[in-house]
Amino acid sequence: SSELEGMKIAGNTFDYPFIHGKAIQATGKYSFVSCSDEAVENGIVTLEDYPIVDYILGLEKEDASAKAYYKTFSSAMQRIISSYCQSGGNILVSGAYVGSDMNGTQGNREFTQRVLKYGYQGSLTDKNSNRINGLGRTISIPRLPNENNYAIPAPDCIVPVDSAFPVFTYVPGNQSAGIAYKGNYRTFVLGFPFESILSEADRATVMAGILGFFTQK
């Protein structure tokens, strides 16, 4: 668009595992390995070998015009994650389209609601809202295109299902931005990419809170 002409815009750099890993390392308690979703789908990596899984979606969604096919959760990945949860796993999911990309069919909605314990309640279109409250702090994410961070124009409003509970809310407006579930397994789902949190200190604190939720008795 014309107002963006001549402006460098940050896009997908795919170093998200590094950003997540740095926040994990900041806790001083955990080590991590990263792999592609294809490695998991092809059985090269088994989720059950890990007590905690961090599923990084970023800006991935199904896009008919894209050359590559991306779906937030492919059918194979839905089966693998369901099995991991049934085995008592802990999974963190974050991305800008975790709800909207899975809302199209009954089967996809059943997976997100029954297994991951969240429902979709629209996307956040108010561009002035870049603050999120949760875990005892206020964090910020970039909503408009800029040179330093990739923008999140329409993060998802996701709501808790069953006994899950809201953990983050968009400000102002108070729509739910993230949920957590604690049962025979635990889930923590963010309607925005974790790596889009602007402050490194905030990322470290939020990650410590999430890992604490997964590991507390």
What are these model-predicted stretches?
Residues 143-186, 191-217:
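C-terminal and late-domain segments of enzyme folds
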Residues 37-44, 75-80, 172-177:
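Alpha-helical scaffolding within the catalytic cores
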Residues 24, 53, 88-91, 184, ...:
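Residue-level detector of buried hydrophobic side-chain packing
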Residues 25, 45-49, 84-87, 159-161, ...:
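Extracellular/periplasmic catalytic domains that process cell-envelope and extracellular macromolecules
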Residues 36-38, 55-60, 94-98, 169-172, ...:
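Active-site-proximal beta-strand/loop segments in catalytic clefts of secreted hydrolases
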Residues 1-52, 56-59, 194-196, 208-217:
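Aromatic-Pro/Gly-enriched surface loop or interdomain linker
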Residues 60-165, 171-172, 206:
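A glycine-rich, often tryptophan-bearing local segment used as a flexible ligand/cofactor-contacting loop or short
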Residues 10-18, 68-75, 201:
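Soluble non-cytosolic domains of exported or imported proteins
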